[in-house]
Amino acid sequence: MPDYDTQTLRDWDRRHIWHPFTQMKEWEESEPVVIVEGEGSWIIDSEGKRYLDGVAAIWTNVHGHCRREINEALKAQVDRLEHSTLLGLTNDRAVVLAKRLAEIAPPGLCKVFYSDNGSTAVEVGVKMAFQFWRHEGKPEKSRFISFTSAYHGDTLGAVSVGGIDLFHGVFRPLLFPTIQAPAPYCYRCPMGRDTPAACGMECLTELERIMESHAGEVAGLVIEPLVQGAGGMIVQPEGFLKGVRELCDRHDILMIADEVAVGFGRTGAMFACGREGITPDIMALSKGITAGYMPLAATLATQQVYDAFLGEYREMKTFFHGHTFTGNPLGCAVALASLDLFESDRLLGKLPNKIKLLQEKLKGLIELEHVGDVRQCGMIAAVELVRDRATKEPFDWEERVGVRVCLEARTHGVFLRPLGNVIVIFPPLAITAEEIDFLVDGLEKSIHTVTGG
């Protein structure tokens, strides 16, 4: 492929690419950063400037960019087989990966249904739960419980179980209705508690009330375990997830865990559900499954869920769902190489020290005048900016303070993305101690510059 100069690439980009979650009028008036290389925790633009990737290529990168072992696995697979369908066939890489996923997943999740992104992985889970109850002779169980501030993707089924009006409101007429429960947001408690210490898990009490009032009609509950991602990296109080599992058991509701963002070591455990010792009935995976290299997703289910779909063909119990690139051998080979690196690098064993260091560095930010909250779960962190710390008054969204802080961070060699007034910290798990220092120091300087305090 020939090399093109930066300005040519910028011009072609503005002429031809429609970027996600982007106001293109502003984009067309900007000078986009063109990334051409990656190395470890860094991305490098067409002019040679290096940026610490503080968002792990949008919450996907695990072992760093351009990791040799993964590159070699991908190259080797390209020379063997690029793609083969799972409709009527199987392939060796998909088989081996499914076995390994079942071995490391929360106990009981033993069946793997492949797709190609997080939204579809969630939709697969929703459709499984819906059809499951029909096969069980309970078609009245057809509704879903979702949470405020939830985000499960951008396809219509995933949007239906989401809860972010900024993203989803315009599509409301296209969506199926869900039953929405309050999600815990300890900094801005929906139950009016002043401090996390005063938390009495009223969100669980309200969830149980909702389940009781819709007894016999709920097929499944969809939840982001431990952390609500796009809602603002909102960390759930300890015990909430386990409480949700207990309520689902009590009311005969399938629990669907969306681990698309939090899976594969991000919370300090291989899977977030493992932090509270629970097994969902269905679990959606993507993003980190290939360490940020390839589009691949998987929806894991228990034997009980799977068995409900077994029968003679004429019984029409087949799960009629699939995607062209389901179980793609290239993606599966990369995912296997990533799992190998988890073991050879002893990555999970190294995370506690990194998590602690990040926690210590973030403590300094809470003293800043316009930092209202700093929250963290594993290698996920968020800094919520406010106009007034005492009242928690947020900055007006029109001021775009979060965007301005992230743009300023680029001048300090750090690439970040905001969620409104919330600055997200989500680096590759392979980040070093020195790079954690660099990231947080750059963020602190940027907050000072933009907010003046």
Swiss-Prot record:
InterPro entries named among the record's database cross-references: Aminotrans_3, Aminotrans_3_PPA_site, BioA, PyrdxlP-dep_Trfase, PyrdxlP-dep_Trfase_major, PyrdxlP-dep_Trfase_small
Binding site for substrate: 151, 287, 322, 417
Pathway stated in the Swiss-Prot or TrEMBL entry: Cofactor biosynthesis; biotin biosynthesis; 7,8-diaminononanoate from 8-amino-7-oxononanoate (SAM route): step 1/1
Positions of modified residues (N6-(pyridoxal phosphate)lysine): 287
A GO molecular function held by the record: pyridoxal phosphate binding
Keyword tags: Aminotransferase, Biotin biosynthesis, Cytoplasm, Pyridoxal phosphate, S-adenosyl-L-methionine, Transferase
Site (Participates in the substrate recognition with KAPA and in a stacking interaction with the adenine ring of SAM): 21
Catalytic activity, reaction form: (8S)-8-amino-7-oxononanoate + S-adenosyl-L-methionine = S-adenosyl-4-methylsulfanyl-2-oxobutanoate + (7R,8S)-7,8-diammoniononanoate
Binding site for pyridoxal 5'-phosphate: 118-119, 258
Cellular localisation: Cytoplasm
Example GO BP: biotin biosynthetic process
Membrane-traversing stretches: none
Needed cofactors: pyridoxal 5'-phosphate
Gene3D superfamilies: Aspartate Aminotransferase, domain 1, Type I PLP-dependent aspartate aminotransferase-like (Major domain)
SUPFAM superfamilies cross-referenced by the UniProt entry: PLP-dependent transferases
EC identifiers of the protein: 2.6.1.62
GO terms for cellular component: cytoplasm
Name of a matching Pfam family: Aminotran_3
Self-association state and partner proteins as the record states: Homodimer.
Function (record text): Catalyzes the transfer of the alpha-amino group from S-adenosyl-L-methionine (SAM) to 7-keto-8-aminopelargonic acid (KAPA) to form 7,8-diaminopelargonic acid (DAPA). It is the only aminotransferase known to utilize SAM as an amino donor.
UniProt similarity note: Belongs to the class-III pyridoxal-phosphate-dependent aminotransferase family. BioA subfamily.
Protein name, as recorded: Adenosylmethionine-8-amino-7-oxononanoate aminotransferase
Organism: Geobacter sulfurreducens (strain ATCC 51573 / DSM 12127 / PCA)
Taxonomic lineage: Bacteria, Pseudomonadati, Thermodesulfobacteriota, Desulfuromonadia, Geobacterales
Recorded name of the encoding gene: bioA
